[in-house]
Amino acid sequence: MFNGMGGNPLKKRVSLLANVGTLIAPIPNKAAYLNGSVPVPKALFSHRDQIEQWQTSVPQGMQILTGWGGRAADIIHNAANTEQTGTYYMPMNFSVAGNSAFQIGASQGQFVITGAGALAFSGSTGDSAILKAKDKIISDTVASPVEEHYRNLFHRTHARITANSMARGEDFQQHFSNPDLMLGTENIADVIRDAPFPNHWISAQFRAAVKTIAIREQLKLRRQTVFIDFGGWDHHAELLQNHGNMLAVLDSALYAFQQCLETLGLANDVITFTASDFGRTLRSNGQGTDHAWSGHQIVMGGPVAGGQIRGTYPSLVIDGADDIGRGGRIFPKLSADEYFCELLRWFGVAPGDMATVLPNIGNFYDPGSSTNPVGFLKP
């Protein structure tokens, strides 16, 4: 897809971003890092901290409860998803991989699903005690004013939230699991079934992502994010075999995912992008590599100016100009904030709101600029 989709050189759907990482401010050179003249992210080389920082875009390590995708949803959900009227509400952030800090906002949450669709309350179908309890919860939300006067406020609030969650789950599931749902002239389920997804557990997440995007009209959503998690890349040993196998799976899954979007007429409406906590050392530890800093990322989709490598490719010389030590730890020249900012501009976040979503963006780029910060998207 870097050189063309399905053999078509006019459909270059993939570009690569070189030398990207978490930064608070630009690091002009190796000496600036070593002498401490520039601030650097907290707890570099720590999986937990760097995963959090990629998802929150707050590398200072402050206690932050929201992610940059969630903060974007806080700003644009109501303005973008105008078909959600009255009491109807469906979150715009979906996760097929459990809870993610990335999608949590101050007012907007995430809708967690599985490969089979919405999470269901165990026993919430059929003639069960849990189903009866569910019916009581729903009835509690419409109790008479006299009855409500004597109810505990926490109980009523919990009942209302639970009832709304159940209703949203049922609404989502009826569309997600509909085998006859069409998008244009294409049957959504058939397109997903026929796509060449690899025989691997990650394919269930990609299939669910396709379907969630394809039913956006039924969910009254014009903007969505879908979070997928493909872990297991910490190859301190058996690097060559494990890394190669996982890259092959990812390659096949991305291709099948993009093929579905092309067939369903959604290719120009979706950008797929990767985010990983850090790269690896240049020097082997014997059978693998250790934690480093900067890495490379993938962007894919119709809006992507494909067939490019954006960013500054680093020197791969041990102890060279870009190696800060410990066996080839490369420092990033392109900030995660610049990467995210270009995506958010396309997504609809206004220049005046960008610093709310990405607090450090002003250290790298003027959000009011007429040009994108990196240039991996089509003008």
Q: Whereabouts are the PLM-identified features?
A:
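Generic beta-strand/beta-sheet core signal
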Residues: 228-231, 273-275, 300
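A structural signal for short secondary-structure junctions
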Residues: 220, 265-268, 289-293, 302, ...
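Histidine-centered active-site microenvironments of extracellular/periplasmic hydrolases
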Residues: 276-308
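Proline-centered loop/turn at the N-terminus of a beta-strand
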Residues: 13-15, 271, 296
